[in-house]
Amino acid sequence: MAAAAVAATATTTLLLLLLCVLALSQAFYLPGLAPVSFCEKAEEHLNCLSTIELYMNRLDSVESVLPYEYNAFDFCKAPESKQRPTENLGQVLFGERIEPSPYKVTFKEETACAALCEPKVYEPGSAVDQANLDFLKKAMHFNYQHHWIVDNMPVTWCYHVDEGKLFCNPGFPVGCYVTASGQPKDACIISTEFKEPDSFYLFNHVDVTLSYHSGAAEGWEGARLVAAKVVPRSIKHAVNEKPTCTGPPLSIPQSGTERVTVLYTYSVSFVETNNIKWASRWDYILESMPHTNIQWFSIMNSLVIVLFLSGMVAMIMLRTLHKDIARYNQMDSVDEAQEEFGWKLVHGDVFRPPRKGMFLSVCLGSGTQIFIMTFITLFFACLGFLSPANRGALMTCAVVLWVLLGTPAGYVSARMYKTFGGEKWKTNVILTAFLWPGLVFADFFMMNLILWAERSSAAVPFGTLVVVLALWFCVSVPLTFLGAYFGFRRRPIEHPVRTNQIPRQIPVQSLYTRPLPGTVMGGVLPFGCIFIQLFFILNSIWSHQMYYMFGFLFLVFIILLITCSEATILLCYFHLCAEDYHWWWRAFLTSGFTAVYLLAYAVHYFRHTERHTHTKLAIEGVASTILYFGYTLIMVLIFFLFTGTIGFFACFWFVTKIYGVVKVD
């Protein structure tokens, strides 16, 4: 009954936490970001601007992992007098490259079919012209998307999808392609005019609509932008005439034997929309994201199932152990105890130091560093500090925290290594500081070389790599040494029972208590509580969707913590009952095996992404495939250390507790 009450209380607490987090998530702009007011040109002053700056972010595609800067294409360029905005560390590492645009937008000054720059002419005999045109064709073939920013919010392309639902995409395509058989691809399906076989249609005109909330009736000056929408169009403008933005679409044949002239034009209109508040201006984007509503029900269903299973595991463990310990302590005969209690028989071997204790302690140190970093990052994300409106903040926060958390990594690694009886403290601290971070950086650097070779905007500049290395060597490494110093100065962790000099022979094990089957089974339940969130996280990374439901993610993090702990404890108990006392590595690998399921799911996502998400992943090309699996490997390694550390310390606590409450002669 007590166990049931504890489980019920835990469930209630978690559900209350969910409600609190969801309430906090409504305050999207609560911390750190202030609104900008805009006025007409005649009323402009320091706190009320008339010029609306339009910025261009990188162009990306769901069919390629290689993003490119706006200026990598032969589009109209911004004047050199315009300054490029400064990007933070997180933006650079994520591959964001924000540049000023050539578009001129003034508040409440509407523009109709204005030429953006001089026409672009591509001669069939010019190698430079054909290279520029071929690069544009590549962008249209792989459905590359523009990403524009106005007043720190994305310019969206809204269109109707299944069942008439309005979907607002924070990007719009460069153009589209009609195959040689006449089959329109991607955005070419929106119009029957796109019908020329084996032809590209470049979207060279945009209709931009800016919605604003006026402060005239609310006592504050000017107006605030609450929505920015764009409608791309393909128009074949008449040569040497003033553009009218009417006429057939601009068709570019696959063959480069014809002269192509491209004139880029734009229109801007303003709409007063006072029913949308500035603080909730992202709602129309977030609410239209694919499967947003389904995610609520799926996650709740998953959480209820996981909580139910966790409660059952907790009740079984508490009741079984309570009876075992009570009955054992009442027995006077050692023979009686040996008859019924397998886990008690190995008390003299259960704390025997593990093989490869050096490597295990290094894994635990790095895993602790990742665990604390993840917890703090998700906590700040729940409070709204790391929302999509605060660009690059999530990655910046994670990197800075990882650097500053070298001390607990060194301390845990040193303390556990000393507990294992290790004496090579120099090797331990060096491996803790360099082994896993070095492997991750080596993988990241190899991926960066590919991005450099492909001239992608996602390639991290050399200067930023130097900064990352400086943070690692000059901050993280010294802090790791400092933590290791304090760890080695402490006494080893005292075990509740003594270890025998002669190891006990382990009996023949049944199938489910052998190392491999137990390890494979141990990762199933933890993976079951994250795979729904994992789908949306992978969509955010590879399909360029916004991820903003950090409240759910934090709750899933807590459930993952509980599930990894309980699954590892349960299997550890079964192995001890089978008189197998080699639990150290098994505890780490049991929960760490969840990372193998993560890898399998990433492979499945790569090959069979759902076809009704409006962001179907269809990566093509050797470079993109290598990049996908290279970055996936980094994610899997980090997740392996994270989950393995959770399972190990849960099992370590469990074993210490149960052997601390029994009477040993």
PLM feature spans:
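Transmembrane alpha-helices of multi-pass eukaryotic membrane proteins
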Residues: 10-16, 293-307, 357-369, 389-406, ...
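Interhelical loop segments of eukaryotic multi-pass membrane proteins
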Residues: 35-42, 318-344, 377, 384-396, ...
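Hydrophobic alpha-helical transmembrane segments
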Residues: 236-250, 339-349, 377-381, 406-409, ...
